[in-house]
């Protein structure tokens, strides 16, 4: 009759997904290996999400935050996870976190932002401070526009390094610890998986 039967019926699908999740974990032991220089984004998102209480609102911006967030974030009961997946708009995180926090009666909100993305709406830090919004920002600093960096490395190898960060010689970012202090935002840094924990 041309109608295909589904591979799984009812709860079989959930059971199959759980088995695959165990067999093919997103966060692997290599993500936790220490290099002493950088915290791994997948390990970070996994660790952070397991430490957050149930019912946490989490907003992820674009790039690494979005990719690692979608794959490694552990969803708990009542958790809300907001993203801009379809267009991955730079600068989405801060205003979306503000909107999510206010719309949910000032519920504690976590915002995962990238160093490039936060620069698009940096002024919103003052909105958060002025309104005493309970928003915790976790900045993934990969020293530039990492998604663009990956595209250039994958497609053009060493022939093209433009507008991606220090290695292109035409783009730099501010000292985020100083920026946080200027806005009156507490700042803590973790440069390795060990420091992160």
Protein language model features and the residues they cover:
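Generic low-complexity, intrinsically disordered sequence content enriched
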Residues: 11-12, 32, 183
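Active-site diphosphate/adenylate-binding microenvironment
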Residues: 16-95, 100
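Thiamine diphosphate
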Residues: 1-7, 68, 73-197
